[in-house]
Amino acid sequence: MIEYLNLKRMTAMHADEIAQAVTGVVNGGRYLQGDATREFEHDYARYIGTRHCIGCGNGLDALTLILRAYIELGRLAEGDEVIVPANTYIASILAVTENRLKPILVEPDITTYNIDANLIEQAITPRTRAVLIVHLYGRCAYTPQIAAICRRHGLLLIEDNAQAHGCRFGDAHTGALGDAAGHSFYPGKNLGALGDAGAVTTDDDSLAATVRAIANYGSHKKYVFDYCGRNSRIDEIQAAVLRVKLRYLDRDNQRRKDIARYYLDHIHNPLVALPADRNNDSVWHIFPIRCNDRDALARHLLQRGIQTLIHYPIAPHRQRCYLAWSHLSLPITEQIHAQELSLPLAPYLSDEECRQVAEAVSDYSPSNGNRP
């Protein structure tokens, strides 16, 4: 079976160095806010190209902390609108609603799966204060058009970089293209920890200090609390693991790109829509294909020993937690959620495994996909 994702194989690529790093933390006796955290924050900020990196508990917390900090700094207020892509993973939207802000859902571009820049400006109202772009599936969502819209209307530009570690726009990394960015280091990500972890990156000194305080119970100084904060801190073990894996991120991403290139060149099936390959601008956290009968294709691949996943089966505006949005008409979002299927793509995959995946997708037809 070619699993969609095998975290044991992923970790084994750097197992010796990870074990050494973890042992160092365990033997050192400092498990929070120690050298490993400071070193990772320094290394990741330098890699991304920002002055600040603040480690936190997870990617959702990273986005939530950014928005909360902007509220504390007076840049946002309860009820303000934040434009977000309608087809994102729900965490991007949860961060907005948790801060009592109003998400404005904008349709994606069907070829890139990222927010359609041509639709942003018409969604702006007098209450709009920010645009949250999501580098979905590993592809850069930033465009000069989006940046110009934000400048013209005085809007914050926030990045959700949970799925695009190492992705670039020109010479700059995603995570350094807007005013601030949230990062997730969930184990399955291109840069993944051995548990939950996240980070905020920014060049804004005031924002960085406020995020760091809110994530530490609201405290800049021990036992002195400036805000009603929360506990969202990266632990020393995760920081040490991430510091090891960061050294190999570009190499691992290149392997992802090579596999994606192989799929793009060797999958030939008129029933399957392959992702666009514009300027090789994705780090391929996910390789998304679309098929009218996605379930039949998934069954066919499983019969061939290939596991797939769906990202994501239910659109945010169709979820029970956002029942008030169920009336919204978002046909492109709904099409993507009805048709998307993710193929195995990870840096540990062998050439033979990639060949089997491409061959099986190419062989699919409605008749063989509907076998019991």
Predicted regions and their residues:
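N-terminal "arm"/small-domain region of PLP-dependent enzymes with the aminotransferase-like
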Residues: 1-30, 35, 304, 344
